[in-house]
UniProtKB/Swiss-Prot annotation:
Disulfide bonds: none annotated. This is Cysteine desulfurase IscS. The lineage of its organism: Bacteria, Pseudomonadati, Pseudomonadota, Alphaproteobacteria, Rickettsiales. [2Fe-2S] cluster binds at C334. Master enzyme that delivers sulfur to a number of partners involved in Fe-S cluster assembly, tRNA modification or cofactor biosynthesis. Catalyzes the removal of elemental sulfur atoms from cysteine to produce alanine. Functions as a sulfur delivery protein for Fe-S cluster synthesis onto IscU, an Fe-S scaffold assembly protein, as well as other S acceptor proteins. Pathway: Cofactor biosynthesis; iron-sulfur cluster biosynthesis. It comes from Rickettsia bellii (strain OSU 85-389). It comes from the Bacteria. Pyridoxal 5'-phosphate binds at A80, T81, N160, Q188, S208, G209, H210, T248. GO terms for cellular component: L-cysteine desulfurase complex. Homodimer. Forms a heterotetramer with IscU, interacts with other sulfur acceptors. Belongs to the class-V pyridoxal-phosphate-dependent aminotransferase family. NifS/IscS subfamily. Its cofactor is pyridoxal 5'-phosphate.
Amino acid sequence: MNTQLNNLILPIYMDYQATTPLDPRVMEAMLPYFTTKFGNPHSRSHSFGWEAENAVEEARGDIAKLIGAEAKEIIFTSGATESNNLAIKGIAKFYGNKKNHIITVVSEHKCVLDACRHLEQEGVKVTYLPIKPNGIIDLEVLKNAITDQTMLVSVMAVNNEIGVIQPLKEIGKICREKGVFFHSDIAQGFGKVPIDVNECNIDLASISGHKIYGPKGIGALYVRKKPRVRITPLINGGGQERGMRSGTLPTPLIVGLGTAANIAYNEMEKDTKHVNHLFDKFLDAINSQISEVYLNGDKDQRYKGNLNLSFAGVEGESIILAIKDLAVSSGSACTSASLEPSYVLRSMGVDEELAHTSIRFGIGRFTTEQEIDYAVKLICSKINKLRDLSPLWEMMQEGIDLKKIKWATH
């Protein structure tokens, strides 16, 4: 339930990696396609269909423009999870009789890892690359992992939990030289950081609508035409979307995604400046008032709308309860129901105790200075209170190594 405090609406939304609010301009663009412009974009015999088809094609062009692609290379899906599945399984099924090896990274989104595990059960060999303590892959390890059987490398652009940006250009160069397809889940980076599919030699890229102030239930997959990339569809039917994804297209949602992409294209610089300023303000204020706070992931090679912080000596779940006026997460929204420490943090080598204390704060287009000020004040007072109550924090301050303690069992 929302409450108001000095013009602040509580709780304050700081979970922009899980989803983003719909930009009012996106809502406005979508509305006519729910009401008067309701035609099926595949109906070729009357103006209702033509009108819807024109809207779909305009959106396709706006999405392509944002990543330096051609409109025909954009295939509409229900979201990034479907796009990731279509890219990975689609390549494996189409090229599987020639090659049988895929490379991905231990810190990928769960849907990429699960799609790969599914293929492993079908006999595909999968290599899961480790990440360095800063969250970024080692390019030499990638190079050495590629064999003559490798058909696909899948590495995300921006990590959903820690916000680090992987070196896409360098990865793309390696893949192109070795004749391997390169897929990237760009859902967290699309419209937020500059990504050019040609500069980065990306062959397939997964996009989500609700991560860029667009609607939920819509996404896209970029599939390169030159040199041509072939995939086997997951869904068969009327042959829409160049035969790669059958089904009637949801015109209102597509218009929403196209509008969101167009806004991002025009306002990325402004959004980046805003987010970077609030990131620096938030982090500097927290660090100046609380000790032993750790930023997870590389400080520079990252999207600054994502701050994953570990607060030594307090449990992440108790922090979330203490700061309930802030809508935050202790990891990916897809796995935050589990109390296991984040697999992304563990794969970076973050100590299990510290991984349990991590909170992901999201900053976005609609975050205000006033909200950041309130958040900092609340976090600092609650962390200090929780640490005062924590015998573990007291022991840490006395220099006791918690790992060496033998706890009695009752």
